[in-house]
Regions:
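Single-stranded nucleic acid-binding surfaces, predominantly the OB-fold ssDNA-binding core
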Residues: 1-124
Length: 124
């Protein structure tokens, strides 16, 4: 899945760039609207260890297979939903672009575009 990065809003910036390994199978579900949403976990390695990050994608995401190394560009969102115990929340990265790292030029392109948008925002 690859899509364009939305233009930077002047009210603030919410930008995530992840490069890591998919650690859970993709879970796809059909929403009430009829649209498909998919989710998976990706692990990154930091100075303090491995961090697992939940990722949500609009539509199907066939490239997110367990063990695949991906570049994800998106934003952080906290969403609320009803569960058996009441209202629950989940914080996740909403992916705007997902590219396998075996396509390094394409991964570099989406990351560079996101960083250029950030740079433009910081210059204003």
């Amino acid at each position: 899945m690859s899509s364009s990065i939305a233009a930077v809003e002047t009210a603030g910036i919410n930008l995530v760039i992840l490069v890591g390994e998919v650690t859970s199978p993709v879970v796809s579900r059909t929403l009430a609207s009829g649209d498909t949403a998919s989710s998976f976990d990706i692990a990154t390695v930091t100075e303090t260890g491995r961090v697992s990050v939940p990722v949500a994608v609009a539509g199907e995401c066939d490239i997110a297979t367990v063990g695949a190394e991906l570049c994800v560009v998106g934003y952080v969102r906290r969403r609320f939903f009803r569960s058996g115990t009441g209202v629950t929340s989940r914080t996740e990265v909403v992916a705007e672009s997902v590219v396998p790292m075996r396509r390094r030029a394409q991964a570099r392109k989406i990351a560079t575009r996101a960083l250029e948008n950030l740079s433009e925002f910081l210059e204003t």
